[in-house]
């Protein structure tokens, strides 16, 4: 998950967030954070613009998601 941390260090870029772990048995706060990001099932992907509020949300669920930078092309 070191790659996730490198991407989080950047700002104002587009990132794709993919849910990699199940929500079963997780804390309610983490489940609500993931649902606010638009992730409900394993494999769900959403594209977001990385800003300070999104960085805070992703920091709390970093072990459950995979981040990748979206290249404009």
Curated annotation (Swiss-Prot):
Keywords tagged on the record: Ribonucleoprotein, Ribosomal protein
Is Plastid included in the keywords of this UniProt record?
Answer: no
Q: Which is an annotated Pfam family here?
A: Ribosomal_L30
* Gene Ontology molecular function: structural constituent of ribosome
* Any one of the GO CC terms: large ribosomal subunit
Please tell me whether the keyword Lipid metabolism is annotated for this protein: no
One GO biological process term is: translation
UniProt-listed HAMAP family: Ribosomal_uL30_B
Q: How does it assemble?
A: Part of the 50S ribosomal subunit.
Known NCBIfam families for this protein?
rpmD_bact
Q: Which family does it belong to?
A: Belongs to the universal ribosomal protein uL30 family.
What is the name listed in the Swiss-Prot or TrEMBL entry for this protein?
Answer: Large ribosomal subunit protein uL30
Q: Supply the source organism for this entry.
A: Borrelia hermsii (strain HS1 / DAH)
């Amino acid at each position: 998950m070191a790659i996730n941390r490198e991407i989080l260090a950047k700002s104002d870029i587009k990132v794709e967030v993919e849910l990699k772990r199940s929500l079963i048995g997780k804390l309610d706060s983490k489940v609500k954070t993931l649902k606010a990001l638009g992730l409900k099932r394993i494999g769900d992907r959403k594209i977001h613009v990385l800003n300070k509020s999104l960085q805070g949300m992703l920091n709390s669920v970093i072990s459950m998601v995979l981040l990748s930078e979206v290249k404009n092309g």
